[in-house]
Amino acid sequence: FSTLGSALAITNLTSVLESDGPFTVFAPTNDAFADFLTANGFASLEEVPVDVLASTLLNHVVGGVNNAADLTTRYINTSASFNAEPDAPLSMYVNTTEGVMLNGMSSVTTADVSADNGVIHIVDAVITLPTVVTFAAADAATFSELVGALTRADQPDYLSVLTTANGIEPAPFTVFAPTNQAFADLYAELGVAGIDDVDGGVLTATLNTHVIAGANVRAEDLVSGSVTTLGDALEIDATTAIITDPNGRTSQVIVTNVQAANGVIHAIDTVLLPQL
């Protein structure tokens, strides 16, 4: 773990992880860091912007002691945060279906290495700062239909847009993300077999209606009233967390504040439709 130690020293985070904690640290191997540097075009750790490196390291740290037996498939908060805002911790998607997979990109290879102030799990890849696409792709049990819609061949290049880094327009994003069940209900409502049977123009307008550009609106910051999306305007009742589309159809926010580095996702139980 010499590379991890060097990274902590460069970012002045060594003292943080030597404090009382307790912490759960997902620790990348030297090979994992080498792969990370190569994939991102860096010749050395020193070439990585210090703020990016610090955020990336904090994205591997979770408060409290989480032994392998305590980890379940769910979202947890890391010690990294959106735009360095302490009230907007970055999420991590833990999938324990087969072993322990983090954000769909890094697997625990050795678990439960005891430390004086917590526990360490060794991982085989650096957990890069997540985008809203990271979570949609990693959480296939919830969002695979949404990803299928976003990546349909006749659609705009949504994945490129939605991976735009914070600080570069049109990021950040607030995404109201329909679940797989929401899409199943939509297909029944429209009388179609699946996403491939939805008209291309309608699909584009529909997807656009689920995205607010230029704002990271967490659940606690939602206000009642009309909100402008990339598509049609929506009406939000912040008290009940119900969203009404232009057709009077309603959707309930069922999971809030899945926080990425370039925006936030709120899962909803009904697909919102543009004015039909």
Regions from the PLM with identified roles:
Residues F1-L276:
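Mature, structured domains of secreted/extracytosolic soluble proteins
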